[in-house]
Amino acid sequence: MVSDVWHNLTVPHTASRGPGRPPAAKAAETRERIIGAAREVFSELGYDAATFQAIAIRADLTRPAINHYFANKQVLWREVVQQTNAVIVNAGRSRAQDETKLLARLSAYFTAAMQADSEDRSAAAFLVTSVLEAQRHPELSDEEHDSLKHAREFVAWAVNDAIARGELTTDTEVDSLVEMLVAVMWGMGFYAGFVGSHQELKAVVRQFELLMSNNLWRLQS
């Protein structure tokens, strides 16, 4: 008995881990909850009005919990930008590169960027918000994860490749065409994130495809 007591006093106690997910998995899950909540709050309120308290409430966490994972609002903003670009913009580029025609490439990229296939388009809303906030707050701009810059680069690549393959004429004004398509994309992105329903967006994308293929209307001779 005495030896048992002495053993218990001298041997460090190893805490038994209860049932449930391991701490690392829970930490990753909490981090994702924060990022998802921040994406929604930033989109709804803008960068200036968004607070850690509002994000904590949306994530069903405490404000100190947000601070535990992200030192300040700018750090959290950059993380949301990075993740949103990785999921949406990169996916759009990947899908588009599987296509061979300009219209199919643009449609694939636009559909992915606007989350037209999803009922939840919070990421599309945030992409638009991130472009606006980068104009208001240049310090928030991150060239590596600049969705406007990436969109412009993709459209320029698609247009130039279409010219090289003979799909567009060689006298095409590339710069103005690229800017027009980028403007259309972000206008549709705003509609996707803040205005239209899922079904309405799908119809808009379809009308865009008809317009670009010159099949939206036919003039009577």
What are these model-derived regions, one by one?
Residues 1-29, 219-221:
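N-terminal intrinsically disordered/low-complexity leader segments
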Residues 33, 37-75, 79:
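Helix-turn-helix
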Residues 44-48, 99, 120, 165:
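Short coil/turn segments at alpha/beta junctions that flank glycine-rich nucleotide-binding fingerprints
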Residues 79, 90-123, 174-181, 205, ...:
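Hydrophobic alpha-helical connector segments
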Residues 82-88:
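Short, basic, alpha-helical segments at the C-terminal edge of helix-turn-helix-like DNA-binding modules
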Residues 104-105, 118-142:
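Amphipathic alpha-helical segments used for helix-helix packing
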Residues 139-145, 149, 163-212, 219-221:
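Hydrophobic/aromatic-rich alpha-helical bundle segments in the mid-to-C-terminal region
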